[in-house]
């Protein structure tokens, strides 16, 4: 049952970005028509695929919170705290503390996930940062949550 929810989360992330790109294309046509200019199609497949990956990671993070906390309401609150409060605090810390600015890409999953909205990481260090933060903030807590769910499920 839990694996079906995981697959649905991944599929939902991919489909939602495809739908958003379609809505954006229609908006581009309408906006260009209203403004009397030619529509601009400057998003590459590389950017579109990294958008899908960023969205899927975000949904997987929400899924992980749901599995780990095992309360939908608490997981939703945790997701918003993580995305808005913690992300804001780490941004302020990075802006004001040079030591954290240098460390942020290695410890802040939201920061490294956000880089995917600009395109795929370039270079080995950027991929390593994405891997380290994904492992620490997503994979490890998800594994713990899955073990806890498996122990608590009625057979």
Map each language-model feature to its residues.
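Short cytosolic juxtamembrane segments of multi-pass membrane proteins
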Residues: 150-155
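Secretory targeting signals
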Residues: 2-70, 87-94, 110-136, 140, ...
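Transmembrane helix segments
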Residues: 72-109
């Amino acid at each position: 049952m839990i694996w079906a929810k995981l697959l649905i989360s991944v599929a939902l992330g991919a489909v939602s970005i495809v739908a958003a790109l379609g809505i954006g294309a229609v908006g581009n046509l309408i906006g260009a028509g209203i403004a009397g200019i030619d529509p601009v199609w400057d998003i590459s497949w590389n950017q579109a695929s990294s958008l899908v990956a960023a969205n899927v990671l975000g949904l997987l993070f929400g899924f992980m919170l749901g599995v780990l906390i095992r309360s939908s309401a608490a997981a939703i609150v945790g997701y918003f705290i993580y995305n808005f409060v913690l992300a804001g605090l780490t941004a302020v810390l990075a802006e004001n503390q040079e030591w954290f600015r240098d460390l942020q890409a290695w410890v802040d999953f939201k920061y490294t996930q956000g880089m995917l909205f600009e395109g795929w990481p370039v270079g080995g260090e950027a991929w390593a940062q994405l891997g380290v933060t994904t492992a620490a903030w997503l994979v490890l807590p998800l594994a713990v949550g899955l073990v806890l769910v498996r122990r608590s499920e009625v057979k």
